[in-house]
């Protein structure tokens, strides 16, 4: 990982998996110049769901959130790049797809606030990335490798 890169957690939710959007979503991040360093197709159990959404425990929508995220497989990913968390959040769009701009993932594919296709770490929550990455991935599951396109994506890299 170079000095200006950061890692961020992204998850295609059950509705995105069921609608066959994994490839489209991965392509968008790759086309942006981000590097995939971890990916895992998995079924979330209730324990992991409670850990992941712990901040919402006690809220009226919590049980529905847990039921939804455990209802079908998800595709968990770790992406790396300069300012990766903000880059990803801008590509994902607003939590409510109805408020998301066309061209964002939720603006293009999201239909419902509760089933909004994708989860991405919050860039305003310091430490959210590390917490979520550690929750879903062991360090040895993340691959650190060079990507030849870096020189063509970032101006401070040499050609």
Curated annotation (Swiss-Prot):
* BP-aspect Gene Ontology terms: CTP biosynthetic process; GTP biosynthetic process; UTP biosynthetic process
- GO cellular component terms, A-Z: cytoplasm
PROSITE patterns per record: NDPK_LIKE
Q: Name one GO molecular function term.
A: metal ion binding
- The EC number on file is 2.7.4.6
Gene3D superfamilies, per the entry = Nucleoside diphosphate kinase-like domain
Q: Which reaction does it catalyse?
A: a 2'-deoxyribonucleoside 5'-diphosphate + ATP = a 2'-deoxyribonucleoside 5'-triphosphate + ADP; a ribonucleoside 5'-diphosphate + ATP = a ribonucleoside 5'-triphosphate + ADP
Q: Which cofactor does it need?
A: Mg(2+)
Q: Where is the signal peptide?
A: none
Amino acids binding ATP:
13, 61, 89, 95, 106, 116
Tell me the compartments it is located in. Answer: Cytoplasm
Q: Which family does it belong to?
A: Belongs to the NDK family.
Q: What is this protein called?
A: Nucleoside diphosphate kinase
Q: Which organism is it from?
A: Halorubrum lacusprofundi (strain ATCC 49239 / DSM 5036 / JCM 8891 / ACAM 34)
């Amino acid at each position: 990982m170079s000095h200006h890169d950061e890692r961020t957690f992204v998850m295609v939710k059950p509705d995105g998996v069921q609608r066959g959007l994994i490839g489209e979503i991965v392509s968008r991040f790759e086309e942006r110049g981000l590097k995939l360093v971890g990916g895992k197709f998995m079924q979330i159990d209730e324990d992991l769901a409670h850990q992941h959404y712990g901040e919402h425990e006690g809220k009226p929508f919590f049980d529905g959130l847990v039921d939804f995220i455990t209802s079908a497989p998800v595709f968990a990913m770790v992406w790396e790049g300069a300012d990766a968390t903000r880059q990803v959040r801008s590509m994902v769009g607003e939590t409510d797809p109805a408020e998301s701009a066309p061209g964002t993932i939720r603006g293009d594919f999201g239909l419902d606030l509760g089933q909004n296709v994708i989860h991405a770490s919050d860039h305003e929550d310091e430490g959210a990335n590390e917490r979520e990455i550690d929750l879903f991935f062991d360090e040895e599951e993340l691959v650190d490798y060079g990507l030849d396109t870096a020189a063509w994506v970032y101006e401070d890299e040499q050609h």
